[in-house]
Amino acid sequence: MLTEGISIQSYDGHTFGALVGSPAKAPAPVIVIAQEIFGVNAFMRETVSWLVDQGYAAVCPDLYARQAPGTALDPQDERQREQAYKLWQAFDMEAGVGDLEAAIRYARHQPYSNGKVGLVGYCLGGALAFLVAAKGYVDRAVGYYGVGLEKQLKKVPEVKHPALFHMGGQDHFVPAPSRQLITEGFGANPLLQVHWYEEAGHSFARTSSSGYVASAAALANERRLDFLAPLQSKKP
């Protein structure tokens, strides 16, 4: 079941909406979803529904609420892509991390929650997934094709919970020197895993993307499920 109209208060009093999906059987672990640059759009709704079908609750906060609340853009529309890039360029990453922390806190204390919370982020959200993991806010974090990870490597020692990252070998946002830095940097912390999908570029896991690579997406999603599975455990 998907629910809208949820309001969450952040660290500074700012409030934002969220899309929430609750599973048939509760309590369950909750996955907070950090959006791409296109807002809480059709792919985010698809991701919430998919996680619910796998037995998770899901919360997808509107991270653009500070700029343009309710943004839900179509990546296939050139004008909307331009709008997304402008929103991304103006996005406050520190505030985004704070808003995700508020969403995680909200998720952890809902009646449908078993108290365990993971995070899955894409693109912008993939970068936020790493920053949230470095803060220790979630039990497990997964990031897809996060942009700018090579600029955050000083935070690698701060990651205290398992985190998994899926990166496209052909991602134009991650040139070869950045790839090397990420691989070596993440290798310094055994809690961090990074998989490179050589045939894939950016947004390879978004089903509506012209860059969608079914084989890479299927493998990444399978690894994601295996990685998140411990959250289903009844053990503390």
Swiss-Prot record:
UniProt function note: Ring cleavage of cyclic ester dienelactone to produce maleylacetate.
UniProt KW keywords: Aromatic hydrocarbons catabolism, Hydrolase, Plasmid, Serine esterase
Pathway(s) per entry: Aromatic compound metabolism; 3-chlorocatechol degradation
Gene: clcD
GO BP term (any one): catabolic process
EC number: 3.1.1.45
Something else known: Carboxymethylenebutenolidase is specific for dienelactone and has no activity toward enol-lactones.
Active site residues of this protein: 123, 171, 202
Enzyme class label: hydrolase
UniProt keyword Hydrolase present: yes
Record carries keyword Hydrolase: yes
Name of the molecule in the record: Carboxymethylenebutenolidase
S-S pairs: none
Transmembrane regions listed in the UniProt entry: none
Recorded family membership: Belongs to the dienelactone hydrolase family.
Domain of life: Bacteria
Catalysed conversion reaction: 2-(5-oxo-2,5-dihydrofuran-2-ylidene)acetate + H2O = 4-oxohex-2-enedioate + H(+)
Binding partners and assembly: Monomer.
Annotated Pfam families: DLH (PF01738)
Origin species: Pseudomonas putida
